[in-house]
């Protein structure tokens, strides 16, 4: 079921991208968008996890190097009926974690040195359960493709804008639409793409919280961890790329600007409240 959902979303986002390309650039725009969509989906599927791990200097560790962390990941992966993911550690004081990998067979769990320092074993289990839920649901692949397509739509709109400014339009020859429609799509399409990306990311965070709590065995493990991580991430800066912020369990960016309205993460208070309500039903 999760594989089917992933495929459907990939197709939907790609078709939307091609549709935007056709409205902005006619047949040539649609063709260009199709080629870009195929290339980006291929690249995101096979290489995105390697890039993000290298971006943060993550180092793979063995059981001998991080026995407690490794034991937690292995035990919870078995409980979730997942293959053992690779375990990585990021040298960063900000307590945070993320999962990556295109499928459960290629799963990776990465945690910072900071998170291992401030969380108890139970809280760390809550975090690992959350990340394993992302792997089980193939959320990382979906989020990566959504972010890639959203960025590409913005790029396509910018290209079209500069082409109109410096090159004019030849709609009759190229099969493009009305110039006003194209102009509106240049403005609206990136916003629509961003909203789709945020909706996908936020809904999947809630689902990973709930399923991760079940994997860990107690929703309060994760709710307590989130409370600590939220305040620590605000106090301890991390040199994080905004394009990968959606991958982390809590937003690694400061979030003290208007961009907080467009956060890829649901409000931390709501996440904690949901988990505490879940704990009362246990």
Curated annotation (Swiss-Prot):
Gene3D superfamilies, sorted = Metalloproteases ('zincins'), catalytic domain
Compartments reported by the entry = Cell inner membrane
GO cellular component terms, semicolon-separated: plasma membrane
Note whether Membrane occurs among the keywords: yes
Record-listed E.C. numbers:
3.4.24.-
User: What cofactor does this one take?
Assistant: Zn(2+)
Q: Which PANTHER family match?
A: PROTEASE HTPX
Task: Return the similarity comment.
Answer: Belongs to the peptidase M48B family.
**What protein does this entry describe?**
Protease HtpX homolog
